[in-house]
Amino acid sequence: MSDVQERLHILLDYWIEHNSEHEKEFRDWAEKAASLSTEAAQLLQKAATKMVAVGNDLMKAREALTKEMEGH
């Protein structure tokens, strides 16, 4: 395994966890914002949903890297 592969694997694990934390935080704040601004709450929920999609792509990238590492 190259240094770049090893570093990327570590970063992907970190980014996946970090992204998940942000998604949860956005949803928490959307609930709090609901009484202040429906639009703000909806936009925070929308951002959280996008974070889920980002997380899915990060997991797919990690899986692809893992497959590549196992293949060599």
Model-flagged regions — what are they?
Residues 69-72:
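Short acidic DE-rich linear segments
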Residues 2-30:
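N-terminal acidic leader/helix
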